[in-house]
Amino acid sequence: MVGVIVLGTLATSAAGCVINDLWDRDIDPFVERTQARPLASRALTVQTGIGVALISLVCAAILALYLNRLSFWLCVGAVPVIICYPLAKRFFRVPQLVLSIAWGFAVLISWSAAVGELEVATWLLWGAVVLWTMGFDTVYAMSDREDDLRLGVNSSAIFFGDKAANAVGLFFVGTVGLLAAMGINLHLHMGVWMAISAAAIVWFLQYSQLRKVDIPKPVYGKIFSQNVWVGFVILAGMIVGEIF
């Protein structure tokens, strides 16, 4: 089951990334951070991109057939969200929320596949993932703010304006609160509390950086990348907390 979930996640993530680049291929060349992407730079053709996306989706669909009924239908529900996310920036003022919900499906699908149902702790973890994603992807959007304003596309960084750093801080505080609530609900032990504490410290330091004036653009990317490792720490803590 773990193998199915991991491979399915990789296939879905690959499809989502390619679909995003397909939708944005006429925008990405004019954004400093994304202008070197294969479709934006014309290193890959649109036909190749569509082919990769379809193959990835087919692989994900085949793997979904090995899941229970609830998990399968959650996979089906995730597809339109993943496909529509890149369009959200054109019509919705906070497109990062759509991305956050898309990421949240990973929690719902994995949990239901393992347990067979969605529990209180499931929704607490789902909420934590949604808020966490809102936080780190708002940071990512802060590096593109000038380009997005010029191109007329939306982002949470633009929506929150000069309060974006405070919004990120609140998202991270909410994430810590929901993770703690999940830990209490599941009676997890020392491992998860150590992981949550470590994550909280990192997020506080990141928030402190974002509060500074005239932040170099590479800092936003660095903070975004740090959250990958924060995720691994939290995952490890949850595993240790469940086992011991």
Question: What is the predicted function of each stretch?
Answer:
Residues 2-9, 25-75, 150-190, 196:
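Multi-pass membrane catalytic core of lipid/isoprenoid biosynthesis enzymes
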Residues 22, 26-52, 83-102, 146-170, ...:
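Interhelical loop and helix-boundary elements at the membrane-water interface
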Residues 13-17, 21, 61, 137:
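Transmembrane alpha-helical segments of multi-pass membrane transport proteins and ion-pumping complexes
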